[in-house]
Amino acid sequence: GAGNTTKLANQIIVACNIQAVAEAFTLAQKAGVDPEVVYRAIRGGLAGSTVMDAKGPMMIAGNDKPGFKIDLHIKDLNNALDCAHAVGAPVPMTASVQEILQWLHNNDCAAMTTAPSPSITSV
């Protein structure tokens, strides 16, 4: 129903946003720019988000204490992909993020939160 579809839509946005934030900070770090400086510069603009404010400082600090586990995101994204396929909705970004999370699961990172530090996303 509408409630379940709304939850799936929320999980798509959250998971994709977390991945985008992690990739942005990885880019900054690999380019020699302090991710904290990048975070402060962009958080008030259009790229800023509740997810960035909640997860960005954790990523920058390398805090990977368990929170919402990767396995739960995988379950939610699998459900979202099933729903999308059933109704014919293209969700390529969701599929890509699900594959990344599945890789983390398969490589013994399943206990991590979905707020990996930039060094994790560069694997």
Model-inferred region functions:
Residues 1-31, 42-54, 72-75:
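Active-site-proximal catalytic alpha-helix in oxidoreductases
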Residues 2, 43-44, 98-102, 119-122:
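Short amphipathic alpha-helical surface patches that mediate protein-protein
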Residues 4, 13, 48-109:
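Interdomain hinge/lid region at the active-site interface
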Residues 8, 38, 93-96, 113:
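Residue-level detector of well-ordered alpha-helical segments, enriched
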Residues 27-28, 83-84, 120:
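Helix-loop "lid/cap" segments that line or gate small-molecule binding pockets
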Residues 34-43, 95-99:
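Beta-strand segments within the central parallel beta-sheet cores of soluble alpha/beta enzyme folds
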Residues 104-123:
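NAD(P)-dependent dehydrogenase/reductase Rossmann-like domain
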